[in-house]
Swiss-Prot record:
Assembly and interaction partners: Monomer.
Family stated for the protein in its record: Belongs to the class-I aminoacyl-tRNA synthetase family. ValS type 1 subfamily.
SUPFAM superfamilies: Anticodon-binding domain of a subclass of class I aminoacyl-tRNA synthetases, Nucleotidylyl transferase, tRNA-binding arm, ValRS/IleRS/LeuRS editing domain
Short sequence motif 'KMSKS' region: positions: 547-551
EC number: 6.1.1.9
UniProt cross-references to PROSITE patterns, sorted A to Z: AA_TRNA_LIGASE_I (PS00178)
UniProt: ATP binding residues: K550
Name of the protein described by the UniProt record: Valine--tRNA ligase
Subcellular compartments: Cytoplasm
Source organism superkingdom: Bacteria
A GO cellular component annotation in the UniProt record: cytosol
Length: 948
């Protein structure tokens, strides 16, 4: 197979992905005789969604892990699937209907759900098609959807079990309510941002007249409309201004109700007036106060956020914000408005509707998070124990604190949503006015049977609500493995092999909403942990650290980075759908300034390498497009290095049939140079590093190790050294070098494959047969490299380090003397003759030398600059500008003296010597010795020039 002259990623990607998939290379391993199993769960994206940068990053990490373990011979499963995404999907379909002037209520539940299924079938494949563009290798044959029949049965089964155990209940509680959607929403679906508002100061008169100089208590509130539902005013029990008033009552303005003054240390004495109105039905903090003090709860808003009939007649039916204006006017008219001050406050809004979220007291279904189960432990306690015992490990470890903190302060989980798209709650009610009995069952027939046992044989009505999307997501670790109610008596190979899975890769933003709930539900239902490790990564942001969002106009599409996009198309994409013309204009201008030529096509491998390199521990990941360019250059470098190897090895005797290992070094067939042994030794170190970094989930360090070996060691040094050996070596040396070129390159391709699958597959297909390692049809199934530490060669490594230092010194001399790179110069070198003679051919090639003259000593009368490289003195024969050379050496002496002073200071510091690692202290001593030795050689040189 002939290799193309240049790397064209699009053609390679289009060819190889269908090949991998059609050959079954992504299929789950189900060999139960193999004790090694690796499983990873794809956090299910919204079924009708599209791929964003967070997906691209997350999936690159998961695919790298999957390919790595697959190549190590593990049974491997990357479990893919999508989420029905209740709210998000329902909103999309409702908007489509709105455009036609139809509401979901016009259609009715059954027909509306049919429409959603139609939309799911139409757009549901978009994100999985995009995942394929990223080169991901999940077992697509096992793809799951949270509303598949099997997963839906699991949802019902777990709900019924938890209800029968008393761990699911229905009750009236305060929840986040989105009045535009008409449903409860989770904390994750609420975005709080600082906005400009006001702090209204309202006086509540004492019921029995003034107390001393006080006519009443003045409260400060940002929401005066909720005062209609006030049931108390609270003060801090130790506040000297008000403590004596606790137990008295005030008259609630506009409502003519008397409410008590209570003491509670929740009150911040320094904020506002130190008096706080208490509205338990419309504020989460007040709700907790209400429970502590056994206060009544008065809902003064309907579910559509209009004032309810529990409020004074004048305000009934008003929108909450209209009511606010009228109430403020009425308070002012009665002389009870003590003041208004501008105030910045956090306003909670629905992330999809932007409607202000209303804390609302409604009937909902809940999971009891802290109630002991049959075994005496709550599901939360079990989840805490899993991590405390080390059964589940977090990487980085600091996320354990976040996990524990949330679980230790957990509230019961509201799992019902007032939607039509989702898993309908399996609960049936007696369809009789005044009968509140409910029967939870697997189906209606079972519900009727349960009702009959309770003496009810009338008509049943199913609960209209559906379950929170996170409920079915919490079951993902076992529902996707075809768990059934008969488990463990009836199981299957996948469930036996892959529960628990090996690692969960997730962003820190869903530790509470998904990670903790998977631990709770999986442990409680199956008795097993869902996964052993949790790798928590940061969130992808733009180069300035800003969150990527449509409104900011800084969103990047991974597919655009792979394929490229013109400036016109990018501007059009970023401004599409924006309602504000000024905002659209600003975003277009910014986009054209940032990307005047658009975005070039980087290809999948360059993008994946970029994502891996950015996977550092931390909360934020700044995505810099220039990194993509750098890694595209890396791919080109690897491609060109392979072309060089093929040009020099195809049709040549590469010694591949010769015996491998140390014995080959002593045969006439193969004569390995110190350069050959060095690159093999460095490869072992790199393989060991990469393995350790994979174990530690340090993908940034995996990419760094691969990059530095390929670019810095193999391409920049070994290939150049190999050119010398191929041109001037004996047949046995040439054969050994060709063998090394091939074997190391083939190994490197396998080493890099998990990160950059397409280019490595394409190159491997050509290189592997020449390297004698083509024992499978794809690099995906080739064995992953493992370090052989017996092949470390410290002597060869030391020689190359010395050679690099000499070459570097020669290059510095050329640069300082402004010698053209094209001009070959003679070098005079003083030092150990046998060593310098062995280096000479390499020096001539790498430092552009016409000859290397080895001498015992460089004469003191020489005026050409003399540089020191370790134990050698080097001089290029060239006409010298004495003054300039004197200045150069003087500067170098001054620099070295400064470095020597720093090193001496460090070593004189007892704290440094005592506390620093011994290796660090030794390094500092060696640096000092090096400075001293170099200065001893440079000072005479300066004296010599000064004497002229």
């Amino acid at each position: 197979m002939e290799l193309a002259k240049s790397f064209e990623p699009a053609a390679i990607e289009a060819r190889w992905y269908p090949e991998w998939e059609s050959r079954g290379h992504f299929d789950a391993g189900l060999d139960k005789s193999n004790p090694n199993a690796f499983c990873i769960l794809l956090p299910p994206p919204n079924v009708t969604g599209t791929l964003h940068m967070g997906h691209g990053f997350n999936q690159t990490i998961m695919d790298a892990l999957t390919r790595y373990h697959r190549m190590r011979g593990f049974n491997t499963l990357w479990q893919p699937g999508t989420d029905h995404a209740g709210i998000a999907t329902q909103i999309v379909v409702e908007r489509q209907l709105d455009a036609k002037g139809v509401s979901r209520h016009d259609l009715g539940r059954e027909k509306f759900v049919e429409k959603v299924w139609e939309w799911k079938e139409y757009s549901g494949g978009t994100i999985t098609r995009q995942m394929r563009r990223l080169g991901t290798s999940p077992d697509w044959k096992r793809e799951r959807f949270t509303m598949d029949e099997g997963l839906s049965k699991t949802v019902t089964e777990t709900f019924v079990r938890l209800y029968n155990e008393g761990l699911i209940y229905r009750g009236k509680r305060l929840v986040n309510w989105d009045p535009k959607l008409g449903t409860a929403v989770s904390d994750l679906e609420v975005v709080s941002e600082e906005e400009d508002g006001f702090l209204w100061h309202i006086t509540y008169p004492f019921s029995d007249g003034p107390v001393g100089d006080l006519k009443g208590l003045t409260v400060a509130t940002t929401r005066p409309e909720t005062m209609l539902g006030d049931v108390a005013v609270m003060v801090h029990p130790e506040d000297e201004r008000y403590a004596h008033l606790i137990g008295k009552t005030v008259r609630l303005p506009l409502c003519e109700r008397d409410i008590p003054i209570i003491g509670d240390d929740y009150v911040d004495r320094e904020f506002g007036t130190g008096c706080v109105k208490v509205t338990p039905a419309h504020d989460f903090n007040d709700y907790a106060v209400g429970l502590r003090h056994n206060l009544p709860m008065i809902s003064i808003l309907r579910l559509d956020a209009h004032v309810s009939d529990d409020a004074p007649e004048k305000y009934r039916g008003m929108d909450r914000f209209v009511a606010r204006e009228v109430i403020v006017q009425d308070l002012e008219a009665q002389g009870l408005l003590a003041g208004i001050k501008p105030h910045k406050l956090m306003v909670p809004r629905g992330d999809r509707t932007s409607a202000v979220i209303e804390p609302m007291l409604t009937d909902q279904w809940f999971v009891a998070m802290t109630k002991p189960g049959a075994d005496g432990r709550s599901i939360t306690a079990k989840a805490l124990e899993c991590v405390a015992s080390g059964e589940i490990r977090f990487y980085p470890e600091n996320w354990i604190n976040t996990y524990n903190q949330w679980l230790n302060n957990i509230q019961d989980w509201c799992i019902s949503r007032q939607l039509w798209w989702g898993h309908q709650i399996p609960a049936w009610y007696a369809d009789v006015e005044g009968d509140s009995r409910v029967w939870v069952a697997h189906d209606e027939a079972e519900a009727k049977s349960l009702a009959a046992k309770d003496g009810f044989t009338g008509r049943l009505r199913r609960d209209d609500d559906v379950l929170d999307t996170w409920y079915s997501s919490a079951l993902w670790p076992f529902s996707t493995l075809d768990w059934t109610a008969e488990w463990p008596e009836k199981s299957n190979d996948a469930l036996d092999l892959y529960l628990p899975s090996s690692v969960l890769v997730t962003g820190f933003d869903i530790i509470f909403f998904w990670v903790a709930r998977m631990v709770m539900m999986t442990k409680h239902i199956t008795g097993k942990i869902p996964f052993r490790d949790v790798y928590v990564h940061g969130l992808i942001r733009d180069a300035e650290g800003q969150k990527m969002s449509k409104s900011k106009g800084n969103v990047l599409d991974p597919i655009d980075l792979i394929d490229g996009i013109s400036a016109d198309e990018l501007a059009k994409k970023r401004t599409f759908g924006l309602m504000n013309p000024k905002q659209a204009q600003s975003i277009e201008k910014k986009t054209r300034k940032e990307f005047p030529e658009g975005i070039p096509a980087f290809g999948t491998d360059a993008l994946r390498f970029t994502f891996a390199s950015l996977a550092t521990p931390g909360r934020d990941i700044k995505f810099d497009l220039s990194r993509c360019e750098g890694y595209r250059n890396f791919c080109n470098k690897l491609w060109n290095a392979t072309r060089f190897v093929l040009m020099n090895c195809e049709g040549q005797d590469c010694g591949i049939s010769a015996a491998a290992g140390s014995a080959a070094c002593n045969t006439a067939n193969l004569d390995f140079s110190f350069a050959d042994r060095w690159i093999v030794s460095k490869l072992q170190r790199t393989e060991a590093e990469v393995a350790q970094h994979f174990r530690d989930y340090r993908f940034d360090l995996v990419s760094k190790a691969v990059y530095e070996f390929v670019w810095d060691e193999y391409c920049d040094w070994y290939v150049e050294l190999a050119k010398v050996q191929i041109q001037s070596g004996t047949e046995a040396q040439q054969r050994a070098t060709r063998r090394t070129l091939l074997r190391v390159l083939e190994t490197v391709l396998r080493l890099a494959h998990p990160l950059i699958p397409f280019i490595t597959e394409e190159l491997w297909q050509t290189v592997a047969p020449l390297a004698g390692r083509k024992d499978t049809d794809s690099i995906m199934l080739a064995r992953y490299p493992e370090a052989d530490l017996s092949r470390l060669d410290e002597a060869s490594e030391a020689k190359i380090a010395e050679l690099k230092a000499i070459v570097g010194t020669c290059r510095n001399l050329r640069s300082e003397m402004n010698i053209s790179p094209a001009q070959r110069m003679p070098l005079v070198a003083a030092g150990e003759a046998t060593i310098l003679t062995s280096y000479a051919p390499y020096l001539a090639g790498l430092a552009r030398l016409s000859e290397v003259a080895v001498v015992d000593e460089i004469g003191t009368d020489e005026l050409a600059p003399v540089a020191v490289a370790g134990r050698f003195k080097l001089m290029l024969r060239v006409e010298i500008d004495i003054a300039a050379e004197r200045e150069r050496i003087a500067k170098e002496i001054a620099r070295l003296e400064g470095e020597m002073t720093k090193a001496e200071s460090k070593l004189a510091n007892e704290s440094f010597v005592a506390r620093a690692p011994a290796t660090v202290v030794q390094q500092e001593r060696e640096r000092l010795a090096s400075f001293v030795a170099t200065l001893e050689k440079l000072r005479p040189q300066l004296e010599k020039l000064g004497a002229r």
